[in-house]
Structures are given as structure tokens and as C-alpha cells.
């Protein structure tokens, strides 16, 4: 996505679909903006990165994981006054969007995460709604629409595999993909379909060098009362491009190991 990393202009690439913009479009095709933001004119993101510490004191950070070094901000869309564009505002946990800005430690994480998610879509893996978006100064961020929030901000039931396995968050790297498969078999309302979708996500993560698909990166959620299904894929990131020194190929064990994975390990699992 190097062609996206440049000042905004009227004839660049769409930040949602990566295809060429038409004359008069700004960062998004109207149809693409409608898909991710619900409006043909994309909302303004009226911040720059150095404001975030003051604007979001509740940002969750981790010192031990790659994804944790990214600030994660909860956003929602504020309707503009007459003839004014809509804009994003930082809100509490009820926000319908999550924003991940750039980080000094690992440059271009937003672009890399969006590209990894985009590649997953190309191979027909269902993913959460996502896109790149620009700060006021043109810097790119990653944005995703929460699937566990209704339009009015109320929460849909959603449990990640740490919760289903009754494990604390600090143990999210302690487990196996076979264990997740058993949890899906136990709790999913459509276990056969969800198991296929789950293993496709694991295989894709291995192929793309993603060693961060831990227990909290797989979840079941309920869109209708009493029925739980596997969520679309989220938080997919090719970590090997960011941390090439990491010898582990997977976040959890597969056939008892995290590295030197072979085709037979998937067959045995």
C-alpha cells in the first residue's frame, strides 16, 4: 500500500478498496464511504497523533504484545450542523468504531493491518468492516467498525476464547488452536461451518506470517437471541514483516508446536 502513503489528492487511491479514485473524490469512493461509515461523504477525523495522549487518557496499552503497542481509541460519528460534515469524536466504550494510529516503535502498522485484512477478503475470509483513514494532517490510521455494537451503541453479546476457556487475559498466549476448535464445537450454534471458517483463518495467518492470533483474537457473538456464531476475522497483522527476528510462526500451539509448522500439522490437528 505504498501508493497510499502520500498527501491526499483528488486522483489517488481509495483508502477502503485501494482502487483509483474518480475526479472529485477525496480519499474514498462514495459507495466505499457508505459501506464503512454509513454515509457517502466520509466523516472528518479532526485530530493529529500528538493530541491523543491528552484526548484519551483511558487508552489501553500493553508492554508485552505487538498489537498492544498501538493505541486503540473508541470513536463514534457526531452529526454535523446544517451544511457541516459529520466528524469522529473520541468517546467511551460505547463507540461504534475503533481507531489505531501510527506508532513510533513499529512504523506503518495501520497500513500493514489493513493490507492483511484486505488480503483475507481476497481469499474470501469474512472480516470485520475496516479501512484506512487520515488524521487532519494526512497521516494514515487504521479504523474498524465494531461488530458487537448496534447502531444505537448498545452491545451485542460477544465472548472471546479467553473468556470461553475461563482464562485471564494475561494467559491469552497459553493454549492451542485445537482447544479453540473444541470451544467452537461446544458453544457455537453452527459448529461445522464455524470450524471451517476458523481453520481458514488459522491457515491464512500462518501463510501471511501472523504470529499474534491468540485466544482473544477469536470470538463468538450473538446477533439473535441464544444463537452464537464465530465472528468475522479481526486484528489480522503480518507480524513477520514487523518483527522478522521472531522465530515463532503462530501465537498458539498447533500439534504441540509454534514453529516449523508443516502441512501435516494442520491435518493432524
Predicted segment positions?
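Regulatory N- and C-terminal appendages and interdomain linkers associated
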Residues: 1-53, 186, 227-230, 269
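N-terminal short leaders/motifs
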Residues: 18-28, 78-85, 215-217
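Short, mixed-charge, low-aromatic patches
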Residues: 28-34, 67-76, 135-141, 154-161, ...
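Short hydrophobic/aromatic-rich motifs at helix boundaries and adjacent loops
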Residues: 43-46, 87-91, 153-154, 238-242
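Conserved ATP-binding subdomain of kinase catalytic cores across diverse folds
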Residues: 51-172
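Conserved kinase catalytic-core segment
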Residues: 104-122, 176-242
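Catalytic-core segments of enzymes that bind and process phosphorylated/nucleotide-bearing substrates
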Residues: 160, 164-179, 183, 223-269
Amino acid at each position: 500500500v505504498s501508493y497510499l502513503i502520500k498527501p491526499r489528492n483528488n486522483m489517488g487511491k481509495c483508502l477502503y478498496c485501494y482502487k483509483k479514485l474518480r475526479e472529485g473524490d477525496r480519499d474514498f469512493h462514495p459507495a466505499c464511504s457508505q459501506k464503512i461509515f454509513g454515509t457517502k461523504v466520509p466523516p472528518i477525523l479532526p485530530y493529529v497523533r500528538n493530541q491523543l495522549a491528552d484526548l484519551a487518557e483511558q487508552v489501553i496499552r500493553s508492554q508485552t504484545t505487538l498489537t498492544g503497542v498501538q493505541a486503540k481509541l473508541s470513536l463514534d460519528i457526531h452529526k454535523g450542523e446544517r451544511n457541516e460534515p459529520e466528524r469522529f469524536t473520541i468517546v467511551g466504550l460505547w463507540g461504534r468504531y475503533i481507531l489505531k494510529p501510527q506508532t513510533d516503535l513499529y512504523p506503518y502498522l495501520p497500513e500493514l493491518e489493513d493490507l492483511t485484512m484486505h488480503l483475507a477478503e481476497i481469499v474470501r475470509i469474512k472480516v470485520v468492516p475496516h479501512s484506512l483513514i487520515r488524521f487532519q494532517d494526512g497521516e494514515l490510521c487504521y479504523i474498524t467498525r465494531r461488530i458487537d455494537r448496534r447502531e444505537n451503541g448498545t452491545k451485542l453479546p460477544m465472548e472471546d476464547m479467553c473468556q470461553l476457556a475461563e482464562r485471564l487475559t494475561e494467559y491469552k498466549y497459553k493454549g492451542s488452536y485445537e482447544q479453540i476448535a473444541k470451544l467452537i464445537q461446544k458453544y457455537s450454534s453452527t459448529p461445522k461451518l464455524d470450524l471451517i471458517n476458523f481453520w481458514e483463518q488459522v491457515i491464512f495467518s500462518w501463510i501471511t506470517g501472523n504470529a499474534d492470533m491468540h485466544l482473544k483474537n477469536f470470538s463468538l457473538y450473538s446477533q439473535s437471541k441464544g444463537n452464537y456464531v464465530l465472528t468475522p476475522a479481526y486484528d489480522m497483522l503480518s507480524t513477520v514483516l514487523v518483527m522478522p527476528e521472531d522465530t515463532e510462526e503462530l501465537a498458539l500451539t498447533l500439534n504441540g508446536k509454534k514453529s516449523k509448522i508443516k502441512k501435516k500439522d494442520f491435518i493432524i490437528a
